[in-house]
Every structure is written in structure tokens, then in C-alpha cells.
Amino acid sequence: MHLGTYRFDGDPDDLLVRYDRMLAGFPVDDLLVHVCVRRNDGITIIDTCPSAADFHSFSTSAGFRGALDAVGLPQPIVDSMGDVHLARTPAGPVPIA
């Protein structure tokens, strides 16, 4: 599992409305670990993909760019953080393949 971040700078209230609209179009079952963090100056999405190659493919895809454009989100600052060693919730470990 590979973790990356998407940083959107701007009015967090506006960005969150747009993010919620975009996320409504994504299949929830496709999200391995997905977190949206409100900041004073924007939002940051923490997201995982099965591999670094999958993260790069998704984050640079025309489909992702189209999803951003459809709801008026700006191009984010994308950071490929690295491979996840452990992910845990109160329900227990998150499977990492």
C-alpha cells in the first residue's frame, strides 16, 4: 500500500464543498485508506493506492484531472509519501498488501 497526499490551498469551506461533490462520484469500495483534513488555509487529502505505480498513474490521469475540473477544484500539490508499513484503526489493522 502506497500513501500520498493532495494539498489544495484556498478557502477550506469552499474546497470542502467541492471535495464532497467529487468524492460522491468515486466508488467507496475503491478507497483503501482515505482521510480529508481541514487546514486554516485549505484542505489536504491523505490517500492510499495499492502501489506507487498505481498512485502515480491515478494522480496524473486525465480521469482524476476531469474529476477535479468537474467540481472546480484546483490542481493540487501532489506528494508521493512512500509505502505504508502499518495502518491501524480501533477495529484493528488495515490490511496492507
Model-found features: residue ranges?
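Short S/T/G/P-rich N-terminal loop/turn motif that feeds into the first structured element of a domain
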Residues: M1-I46, P50-A62, V71-A97
